[in-house]
A protein has these predicted regions:
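Short alpha-helical segments that sit at the start of domains
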Residues: 1-20
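A cross-family signal for key residues in well-ordered alpha-helices
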Residues: 13, 28, 79
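Short acidic, hydrophobic short linear motifs in intrinsically disordered regions
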Residues: 21-31
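Short, positively charged loop/turn segments that connect secondary-structure elements
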Residues: 31-42
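Basic amphipathic alpha-helical segments that dock to polyanions
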Residues: 43-53
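Beta-hairpin "wing" of winged helix-turn-helix
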Residues: 52-62, 69
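Amphipathic alpha-helical dimerization/coiled-coil segments
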Residues: 81-91
Length: 91
């Protein structure tokens, strides 16, 4: 996960926290967090990068809608990151 941008890490966490979200649901969550519009031209290429890296999987819900799920590798990467952060953030 060290090679991801902050935006990509945030996307990964959103996908992990939602139940098979479609792109628009991910977009809405990101906009709520960032408090500004997230354009499709930023969102979908970064989701595709996470798919290419094997951190999330893209499935097809219907002909127009894709959904995203966390892979086992994505889950491990998040757990490793949380453990690393805890090393520096623990009391």
């Amino acid at each position: 996960m060290y090679d991801l941008t902050g935006f990509q890490r945030d996307l990964l966490l959103v996908v992990a926290g939602l139940d098979e979200p479609h792109g628009l649901a991910v977009k809405e969550e990101m906009e709520e967090y960032y408090e500004k519009e997230v354009h499709h031209g930023r969102l979908y290429p970064n989701l595709d990068t996470l798919v290419e890296k094997g951190l999330i999987k893209k499935g097809e819900r219907d002909q127009r809608t894709n959904y995203y799920t966390l892979t086992a590798r994505g889950d491990r990467e998040i757990a490793d990151r949380q453990q690393w952060e805890a090393t520096y953030l623990s009391d």
